[in-house]
Amino acid sequence: MTSPVFGDMFTLPQPKLDSSDNTDEPHYHGLPVIDLEEDSCTLGHILSLCHPPSCTGKQFKVNNVRELRAVLEAATKYDMETVRCVALEELSKPPILREDPVRVYALACQYECHKAARLAAKYTLALPSLVREYVPDLEKIHVGKLFRLLSYREACIAAACSLAVNHRWIVHAGSLRPLFGCTDGDLGWTTVRNLPSRKYPSGREECKSAHEWWFEYMKRSECVLQRWPDANAVKDEKLVDDALAAISASKCGKCKASQVSEAFRSFVNTFAENIEHRIAEVTPIRSDLEG
């Protein structure tokens, strides 16, 4: 945990201080005091790594990204490689990633911590908007790394939206059966032509149908996913509640609202799971993170 910077400093000869000398430099018991720019919180985190927890009763634990950045800057400044490595490991911890993934991504790129950068990129997908306000840490990374983050998000958006547009992934059986197949001509419904269809030996193909409210939900889901490529986007409370309200108001003579509502809730969960799987298939940000 030693710092070569301080190690070399302590070997320098110190001038003898005479009582008659007039100096404004602070001293303690005749020894010069070195002022450090870091605050007590940052130095406390570093010292917690220099002394065993059994002696101090403290373990290295930062409370937020701001504290972690300060420790990284100090560790780099004083050439404390072990402290730097421990601090970089904190970048991959979920609490830190959830707090501000864009800022964590910038720090990970700045300090070439590729694992944390890839994790942070994935966590940014949970943000309804990638950058809601100015992030100073982005100034310290190459524009190419920011471009890769934006490209990754765009690829995830395309992957998620494809599920809202092309419905061939839907299996209209089991718990989802009540959603498809209604043929009540008095209600607004549309044939789902890109759903997996049932083919008969004669070659006739049976297309499935879905009510207009379902298509409205899928269209709105696509709009939300275009800015928020995350499984939770299609579980948005208003989005789901509006669809459930439409189910209750449809008054279909052939469909029981309670069964359709239950099937729809099951569909939403299946939709979200498929989004997670599709996004997981997107090629992650390059591990080398070159500019």
What do the PLM-derived regions correspond to, one by one?
Residues 129-235:
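Long, charge-rich C-terminal accessory regions
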Residues 70, 74-75, 87, 106-108, ...:
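A sequence-composition feature that detects small, non-aromatic residues
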Residues 23-25, 32, 38, 67-69, ...:
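Generic structural signal for short, flexible, solvent-exposed coil/loop and linker residues
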Residues 1-60, 209, 213-291:
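BTB/POZ (also called T1 in voltage-gated K+ channels) oligomerization domain detector
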Residues 5, 33, 62-65, 71, ...:
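Extended aliphatic helical segments
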Residues 45-140:
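Post-BTB helical module
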